[in-house]
């Protein structure tokens, strides 16, 4: 699981 990509996606959604 690419947590860094997921983190960036979450920040993008917020």
Curated annotation (Swiss-Prot):
Please provide, alphabetically and separated by semicolons, the GO molecular function terms listed in this UniProt record: toxin activity
- How would you summarize where this protein is expressed among tissues? Expressed by the venom gland.
Does the record bear Secreted in its keywords? Answer: yes
Which residues does this entry mark as bearing Leucine amide? 14
Q: Does the keyword Secreted apply?
A: yes
What are the record's GO terms for cellular component? extracellular region
Cystine residue pairs: none
Question: Where is the protein found, in the record's own terms?
Answer: Secreted
**Key words, A-Z:** Amidation, G-protein coupled receptor impairing toxin, Mast cell degranulation, Secreted, Toxin
Identify the main location: secreted
State what this protein does: Mast cell degranulating peptide. Its mast cell degranulation activity may be related to the activation of G-protein coupled receptors in mast cells as well as interaction with other proteins located in cell endosomal membranes in the mast cells.
Family, as annotated: Belongs to the MCD family. Mastoparan subfamily.
Name under which the protein is recorded: Mastoparan-J
Organism of provenance: Polistes jokahamae
